[in-house]
């Protein structure tokens, strides 16, 4: 097993600041923007997504998500995160979020599941600053120590966990229809 700081395994980016993107920039049809409210268990909630035009998307291209990215809440529930799958590739993330883009040294799904561990979530909550509203930034998140095996084993682990998540999702849909 290896150990490295997250900053050594991923590019960590804060979302656009308020001066870069305003509510007036939102359009009815366009590229969806993930906000803290849309972070769920692995997947994003797709309800009431703000959207921006292609012009704004091109202007703010460093905030465009790619498959394999992990999006974190920067304020409030700082231990919440979601995984960017193929369906959400090309979406954007808001200023109240942080985007983690893993290097090739670590499997992105393995890293996502690592952040789902209760001990990792607790560590993130503990490093947050702010008495009334906890918050994290790129520097603080980069201080998380990640323990990981060889890449092949990471992929096996994340494959098993992803298959379990898929079965849970199917069961939830069945239960919703009862």
Q: Which residues does each PLM region occupy?
A:
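Non-catalytic DNA-recognition/assembly elements of restriction-modification systems
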Residues: 1-17, 143-177
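Sequence-specific dsDNA recognition surfaces
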Residues: 7-23, 37-67, 87
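Specificity-determining recognition surfaces
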Residues: 23-25, 32, 117-146
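A generic structural signal for short beta-strands and their flanking turns/coil linkers
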Residues: 30, 48, 94-96
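A short beta-sheet element
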Residues: 35-36, 54-118
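Short glycine-enriched loops at secondary-structure junctions
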Residues: 39, 77-78, 129-130
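A short glycine-rich beta-alpha junction/loop motif
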Residues: 90-98, 106-109, 129-158
